[in-house]
């Protein structure tokens, strides 16, 4: 069972099993949908599939029907293997001050 505890940063939650900290997730919620914009796990847990377990825990809430994640391009195949569909009709664009 995963526990999501609010942090001092808006919409960011520390994720733990109660005794062990796993990382943190930032997400926005609208109606019955969640959009995760940042998911970080503790470095020593990399390669253990913790990211998809955290997202599955969010999706398992009875009032959530859909979860989306903003992912770096190099992690797209990881999330596709976890059951996510890549929707290539959207792309994040960034503009910085000159």
What does each model-found stretch correspond to?
Residues 8-22:
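Conserved beta-hairpin
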Residues 39-46:
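A short, internal acetyl-CoA/4′-phosphopantetheine-binding micro-motif in the GNAT/acyltransferase core
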Residues 60-73:
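Conserved GNAT acetyl-CoA-binding A-motif
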Residues 72-96:
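Conserved active-site alpha-helix within GNAT-family acetyltransferase domains
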Residues 46-60:
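Conserved acetyl-CoA-binding loop-helix of GNAT-fold acetyltransferases
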